[in-house]
Structures are given as C-alpha cells and as structure tokens.
C-alpha cells in the first residue's frame, strides 16, 4: 500500500524533481497539479526513452489552451505559470498521445469551467486514470469517439485504488 499526502505541499524544489525523475518523462505530468497548487511549475530538461526522442509539444499546447504561460527559454528546463489559475478549454489532439491525454485530464479536473478533449488516447491506463480521478470527485465523461468532457471541480479527495499492472513491463 502506498499513501501519498500532498495537502501541505508549498514548494516543488527543482533539484528534488530532477533527482527523483532521472531520465523519466514523468515530471511533465506534475505541471497541472503544481499549477493548481502553486501557480507555477518548473519541469527539468526531459530526455527521451527507449523509443527515442519524444517531444512534449502536445503537453505544452494543452497547458497553454488551459491558460498557462510556457517559458521554454530557461536554461535548465521549462517554466510554466498560471497565477490566475487554469480554465476550461476546447482541445484537440492531432494524435492520440497517452501522455498528453493524461496531462489534459490532470490539469483540467481542477480548472475553472468545462474542458472538451477530442482525439484523446483511450488505452487501459487512461481509463484507469479516469476511474481514479472520478473516485477523487472529478466529473469526467468519455464518448465512443474518444472525446472526453471534464467539468472542473474545486477540490479532489482521497481514494483507494488498485493500479493496473504495466502492460509493457509485464
């Protein structure tokens, strides 16, 4: 059992995120939650993975459409701000990216207003994330045409969930 309690997070130290993430691409997924909690996020320079170089353009464009400002000029990574919070938006992914779908879900659940995400990925891990967010109080519906509708809520609550096994690592 893993228990994560982030209710008192006031700072996300860049060095800690960089050290804990290694060459993982996971830090980009911290952006939405950090923007909601702190009004800013710093994402260290991300590498690729076993697949090769993988741009994060869809992630950044999603955050921009939700109201964030993205500064890619920082020498050590990407600085993202949303001092006035995030807001709902209509977003279309030109490719059903798993990471960009996760990014949109994690950022939109606490955004002010409604978000419509079309062209989304619907892999089992995505549907499991939707189930987790719904257990936490998120309002999300998924249409058969891969369109997600997310109604922002003021807060999420704790939950108990058994995660799926990793299909790639299994």
Where does each model-flagged region fall?
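Structural preference for solvent-exposed beta-strand-turn elements
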Residues: 1-170
